[in-house]
């Protein structure tokens, strides 16, 4: 079975006032121990840069031996019907390599899936978790590209109340 085919245990669902699914949580097997010790949030997507951020966080977690890794994946807003049908599928596909990396290292994790502005949702989740810090990959944009397209890592770095590690 490939990592993309492995469906982790659903740990929670969140709906907005209109009943639209807006967030999901999944646990590794075995799940993170409770309470979380030294939680770190790692932003994940399907990119190689995102995977490098996960690999860096995994190495740090293994070295610390007491670090809880929370993966967060943010999707753009979807309609109510699309969210119910596709949110989990999209997020599990986009995070498959990240989850497989942590599983191979023997590190438990929790995957948080949300819809909305990526930087905003990453920071909101980090604050909610009382994360020690955030690890995020850089897309490697130059100055002009960053101005034109925006940079999630740049926005997180400047708005986060906790330390942010940007992995190139």
Predicted regions and their residues:
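Structural beta-alpha unit
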Residues: 1-35, 103-134
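Small/aliphatic-rich secondary-structure junction motif
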Residues: 30-85
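General small-molecule cofactor/ligand-binding pocket signal
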Residues: 70-72, 110-114, 165
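Short secondary-structure boundary segments
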Residues: 73, 138-139, 168
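Short, surface-exposed alpha-helical segments at coil->helix boundaries
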Residues: 84-96
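Glycine-rich, Arg-bearing micro-motifs that act as flexible, cationic patches
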Residues: 136-158
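Short, flexible loop segments at boundaries between secondary-structure elements
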Residues: 162-168
């Amino acid at each position: 079975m490939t990592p993309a085919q492995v469906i982790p245990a659903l740990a929670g669902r969140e709906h907005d006032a209109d009943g639209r699914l807006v967030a999901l949580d999944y646990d590794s097997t075995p799940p993170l121990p409770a309470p979380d010790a030294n939680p770190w949030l790692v932003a994940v997507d399907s990119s190689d840069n995102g995977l490098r951020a996960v690999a860096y966080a995994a190495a740090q977690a293994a070295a610390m031996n007491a670090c809880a890794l929370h993966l967060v994946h943010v999707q753009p807003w979807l309609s109510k019907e699309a969210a119910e049908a596709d949110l989990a599928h999209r997020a599990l596909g986009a995070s498959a390599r990240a989850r497989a990396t942590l599983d191979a290292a023997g590190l438990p994790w929790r995957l948080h899936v949300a819809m909305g502005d990526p930087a905003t949702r990453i920071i909101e989740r980090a604050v909610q978790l009382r994360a020690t810090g955030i690890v995020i990959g850089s897309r490697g944009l130059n100055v002009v590209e960053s101005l034109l397209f925006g940079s999630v890592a740049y926005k997180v770095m400047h708005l986060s109340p906790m330390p942010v590690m940007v992995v190139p």
